[in-house]
UniProtKB/Swiss-Prot annotation:
This protein's name: Pyruvate dehydrogenase E1 component subunit beta
Gene Ontology MF term list: pyruvate dehydrogenase (acetyl-transferring) activity
Cofactor names: thiamine diphosphate
Function: The pyruvate dehydrogenase complex catalyzes the overall conversion of pyruvate to acetyl-CoA and CO(2). It contains multiple copies of three enzymatic components: pyruvate dehydrogenase (E1), dihydrolipoamide acetyltransferase (E2) and lipoamide dehydrogenase (E3).
Amino acid sequence: MAQMTMIQAITDALRTELKNDENVLVFGEDVGVNGGVFRATEGLQKEFGEDRVFDTPLAESGIGGLALGLGLNGFRPVMEIQFFGFVYEVMDSVSGQMARMRYRSGGRWTSPVTIRSPFGGGVHTPELHADSLEGLVAQQPGIKVVIPSTPYDAKGLLISAIRDNDPVVFLEHMKLYRSFRQEVPEEEYTIELGKADVKREGTDLSIITYGAMVHESLKAADELEKDGISAEVVDLRTVSPLDIDTIIASVEKTGRAIVVQEAQKQAGIAANVVAEINDRAILSLEAPVLRVAAPDTVFPFSQAESVWLPNHKDVLETARKVLEF
């Protein structure tokens, strides 16, 4: 075991798969020589060579097309979109081609592409760099969307993503890159995609969330505990496909739920989770399921982040509304 930040765990996962499989390639803007804008690929080009870890032009559409072609020719590309706000440039390759390849070819062709990208607020970047656009890609059939909240989860999930035979969007919250360390096995391990994790057991309320909001939700759960309220925190980890069984099991146990996301409220992951709960567990509910999310505006300039982003106080306020219903 070693104490790792999330960025170190991601680097370790990439190194593991580059060693394990000569068909794994890692590339993107500034990924090679500089080791990535956040140094996630630092040292990998020197270790594995320019043919396997390399820089690309500043053109997301070209990076996506390259990954698509490599995936169809026996490689396992790990492409990086430098910030997920730039995903619009590559959506045709991702949702129009990669996601449909298995269906189009009747299972004869697949796109084993991993799309890594930083996202999320709290670090005062320009708005396009921080956008939470997971809902945009999660809506596309044929794509898995993974968002880890801890270093341990990041390594295991990324290894699983690279080994998956279909496209996986792997989103890394910038605020979590170096905010804390955690014990992470130095040997390889995997975490199954599509499986949520109960980060805190509880009996009175289910808080269902993912990414950086896991930590805000855990803070809120600590505050609720002071009032004698036992809150369960469910980390989705994979937002597409959802782990419906874990969500419903938690809600049926507690009878109350809130769903927390950093992204804007409209058409988000939280809305999908609420709909699934209402479809499958409405008779178990003792109160309406409420959401915590950002306002339906564009991501603000960095000075306004603190009033725009959801935090543990918002989670706490919403939880109390549900508990008092």
